[in-house]
Amino acid sequence: PSQPASSRAEEPASQASSEQASSAEASSQASSAPESAQESSAPQNDAAYGEPLPETERVRSDYFDDAVFVGDSITSGISLYQIMDNADVLADTGVNFDTIYTKESVRQEDGTRIPIMDALAQKQYAKVYVMLGGNEVGGDSEEFFLARYGSVLDDIKAMQPNAIIYVQSMLPVTRNNNYGLDNAKIDQFNQALMGL
């Protein structure tokens, strides 16, 4: 897709901050363009709490030193393709609102694996980027989807009380997908996410 996913910021419980980034910034790090002195380390914008974040200026890669990306197979691509080696990625194929708590997805230093939410609780971050829902939107009602997503976000907020939480929209699908998804439903659910 040529359009970046939009994001919604959740203010941290113990700090108000104008430091907000869009997923466009995250995806812009994938390009091989060199960093320059014109790039900032922290984007600035006037987005209100809970509103979509506008695209902001490009940031240096060190902006993501204290960031974590949480999600399913789409998010896994960040580590798979080594887009941002300095950010942590807690993601796995097929992760949904249930398996984020149970599926042993994250490899520990000792070789064992633990669920994403257990791994998230082990370290404090300044920025948490969340992209979930693609594995649910095909079958869940909007109300059920929002209740489950909201529960996961509440748990993330409790674990990361000082972090800014960015809820990224689900990406569109091609016409030939086999998962009961269509872009109209994805758009509907993305709009509904704005109310969380």
Each predicted region: which residue ranges?
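N-terminal cationic-hydrophobic initiation segments that often serve targeting/anchoring roles
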Residues: L120, L153-A158
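Alpha/beta-hydrolase-fold catalytic nucleophile elbow
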Residues: M131, Q168-S169
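A short helix->loop->beta-strand "cap" motif at the edges of active sites that frequently abuts
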Residues: Q160-I164
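Charged helix-capping and loop-helix junction motifs
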Residues: E142-V152, N183-F189
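Conserved SGNH/GDSL esterase-like catalytic core that processes O-acyl groups on lipids
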Residues: E57-R148
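Active-site-proximal loop/turn and secondary-structure-junction residues that shape catalytic pockets
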Residues: E136, L171-V173
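N-terminal, intrinsically disordered, polar/charged segments of Gram-positive cell-envelope systems
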Residues: S2-D66
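Substrate-gating cap/lid alpha-helix
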Residues: T174-L196
